Amino acid sequence: MNDSQYNLIAEALLLAIEEAIEDSGVDIDYEGVGGLLTLTFKNNSKVIINKQAPLHEIWVATKFNGHHFVLNNDSWTDKRSGEEFWQFLSNAVSTQAETELTLSAQ
C-alpha cells in the first residue's frame, strides 16, 4: 500500500467512526481534525484515534492503554492482540461510555 492509498483508507475509517458514533444514539462528543479524532464521554474520559501515516497504522489511546492497528486483508487489526478494530473500539467505547454499544462501519 502506498501513502496515497493509506491516507484514503485511513480517512474513510475516521469518517466511518464519526458516523457510527452519531448513529449510536449515545451521548459521545467527537472532534476530528487533521487525522486525529477525539471522542469525549460524559465522565470526561477520552478515546483518541489518530493516523500514523509514516507507519501506515491507526493508533488508539483509551483511558486504559494504547493500541496500534495495521491493515490486513481489508481489516484493521491490533498488532499485539490481533483483535479486529471495530470489536476493540466497541468494547473501549462501551467501557468509557458506561453503556453497552456496538459500533461498525456502515
Swiss-Prot record:
Protein name: Iron-sulfur cluster assembly protein CyaY
Organism in which the protein naturally occurs: Colwellia psychrerythraea (strain 34H / ATCC BAA-681)
Origin: domain of life: Bacteria
One Pfam family it belongs to: Frataxin_Cyay
Gene Ontology cellular component annotations, sorted alphabetically: cytosol
GO-annotated molecular function: ferric iron binding; ferrous iron binding
Keywords of the record: Iron, Metal-binding
Function comment: Involved in iron-sulfur (Fe-S) cluster assembly. May act as a regulator of Fe-S biogenesis.
Example GO biological process: iron-sulfur cluster assembly
Protein family according to the UniProt entry: Belongs to the frataxin family.
Gene: cyaY
NCBIfam families attached to this UniProt entry: FeS_CyaY (TIGR03421)
